Amino acid sequence: MIIYLHGFDSTSPGNHEKVLQLQFIDTDVRLISYSTRHPRHDMQYLLNEVSRVVRQGDDPGALICGVGLGGFWAERIGFLCGIRQVMVNPNLFPQETMPGLIDRPEEYADIATKCVENFRSRNRGRSLVLLSRHDEVLDSQRSAGLLAPYYDVVWDEQQGHKFSSLSPHLQRIRAFKSVA
């Protein structure tokens, strides 16, 4: 099972395309949609939904995959639910990059301090990070600097921020999922 978390643009047709691409790895791909506008509510909702889906599923190798803002959530929710994560161009600093787009961006900074202390050290090796060298929205180098000490970081030379095609990375994601 793969749980997919969309980014800020929850209505983008690219989400459906990514779900279809992920079905080449596992036919059981579940999109969990969330508001993107209310961080604390989103955290509680996603934690409850992902936990429920994982409990109901029978896949010991369940994986959570998030793009952009969904990558921010995939890392944290995956850690808290004990499943491996794939982050695609994760928005690690939404409090900086999304003021004016979300109601309370400062809640993201607060959430970051509420997660288990040093959670990345405890989560070491349990996340795969795909970063675009041509991300027109986020500073990929900053993300790599923060995440590379803990996770494998794979650079993509073609994609932009929305990372419309996961196809070149499906084999790597499949191998990462099978390690569970």
Curated annotation (Swiss-Prot):
> What SUPFAM superfamilies does UniProt report for this protein, alphabetically?
alpha/beta-Hydrolases (SSF53474)
Matches recorded under InterPro entries: AB_hydrolase_fold, UPF0227, UPF0227/Esterase_YqiA
Where are its TM segments located?
A: none
Q: What domain of life does the native source organism fall in?
A: Bacteria
Protein name, please?
UPF0227 protein NT01EI_1813
Q: Which family does it belong to?
A: Belongs to the UPF0227 family.
